[in-house]
Regions:
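Anionic-ligand binding patches
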Residues: 2-18, 22-229
Length: 229
């Protein structure tokens, strides 16, 4: 329902930022990428929340529902402490597979599938596909929501181009990283140190866009409904 003039929006500085992911690898990367922003960083576990079911058909839809879930739970349990949320939905798009696994990247081999199972299915799906036809990209869509009353969250999107290997390389990162080859570097994503990966990756690039927009738009605040009169 639109706000009436008697309930004009006011702004309250956010003191907490909920990182709306249940993925330990993403959580580590988010904590590194968010250094320097004026928030106490909380995970979903910190607010007693489980990740919601990802029912969206697009990365944007899933990122939005995850951010909305986090700020809604935080608002119900925060005792008046303002909280914003950041969520991403990201995945691998392989051209030879018509963009799969896409939004189903985390559950490509089934709900709750391990990274090893997802990678095994990917390798099997690409059996016989020559290296020149294994182009792929990681895509990340980030949503920053300033609170439960935020109807216009900030969105940033970035991609990371590469190719899919048929054998893994490296032991770092998570997900499909050991199979994600970066021709210009001669390395897989799993062979990059964390700091370098965060500078180059889809998530790192999207986060830099988001940080720039937060500063440019002065969005480091949380919208609230404050009765006037």
């Amino acid at each position: 329902m639109p706000l009436s003039s008697a309930h004009a929006p006011s702004r309250q500085a956010a003191s907490r930022l909920i990182i709306a992911t249940g993925n330990p690898g993403k959580l580590r990367e988010f904590r590194a990428l968010l250094v320097g922003l004026p928030f106490e960083l909380n995970s979903l576990a910190d607010i007693g929340a489980e990740p919601p079911e990802e029912t969206g058909a697009t990365f944007l839809a899933n990122a939005t529902l995850k951010a909305r879930h986090a700020v809604t739970v935080a608002a119900a349990t925060s005792s008046g402490v303002a909280a914003a949320a950041i969520a991403d939905d990201s995945g691998l798009e392989v051209d030879a597979l018509g963009g799969a696994p896409g939004v189903k990247s985390a559950r490509y081999a089934g709900l709750g599938a391990s990274d090893a199972a997802n990678n095994a299915k990917l390798v099997a799906a690409l059996a016989g596909v020559p290296p020149a036809e294994r182009s792929a990209r990681y895509r990340c869509v980030l949503v920053f929501m300033r609170g439960a009353a935020d109807t216009e969250p900030l969105v940033a999107e970035a991609v990371w181009e590469g190719r899919i290997l048929d054998v893994p390389r490296g032991s770092g990162g998570f997900g499909y990283d050991p199979y994600f080859w970066l021709p210009e570097l001669g390395l897989s994503a799993a062979e990059l140190d964390p700091a370098r990966k965060n500078r180059l990756s889809h998530r790192g690039r999207a986060m830099q866009m988001l940080r720039d927009r937060l500063v440019a738009r002065d969005w480091l605040t949380v919208p609230t409904c404050k009765h006037q009169g």
